[in-house]
Amino acid sequence: MDKSKRPFRKSKRSFRRRLPPIGSGDRIDYRNMSLISQFISEQGKILSRRVNRLTLKQQRLITIAIKQARILSSLPFLNNEKQFERTESIPRTTGPRTRK
């Protein structure tokens, strides 16, 4: 086959695997707040394994640690700061509505 008629092929590039967020020396524990807070969203939800890039065992341990910290009041169950902030309300018009 001629080079011009060959089907397009992607060049094989080596990719660099990202390092896991939990090192071998890190202990997954409910008291380790700096580690636990990496795996919680701004709303206070536990992030998924795909987002965290954790193994199944690590994700299970993180989930248990977060739940223990919530029960012991180290972590809030919800983080709804936006709910209590007051925003400027839009003034309502009291006139009759017109249809076009």
UniProtKB/Swiss-Prot annotation:
GO terms for cellular component: chloroplast; mitochondrial small ribosomal subunit. NCBIfam families: S18. Residues 1-19 have a biased composition (Basic residues). GO terms for biological process: translation. InterPro entries: Ribosomal_bS18, Ribosomal_bS18_CS, Ribosomal_bS18_sf. It is found in: Plastid, Chloroplast. PANTHER family: 30S RIBOSOMAL PROTEIN S18, SMALL RIBOSOMAL SUBUNIT PROTEIN BS18M. PROSITE patterns: RIBOSOMAL_S18. One of its GO terms (molecular function) is small ribosomal subunit rRNA binding. Residues 1-23 are annotated as: Disordered. The lineage of its organism: Eukaryota, Viridiplantae, Streptophyta, Embryophyta, Tracheophyta. Its main location: plastid. HAMAP family: Ribosomal_bS18. This is Small ribosomal subunit protein bS18c. Pfam families: Ribosomal_S18. Keywords: Chloroplast, Plastid, Ribonucleoprotein, Ribosomal protein, RNA-binding, rRNA-binding. Part of the 30S ribosomal subunit. Belongs to the bacterial ribosomal protein bS18 family.
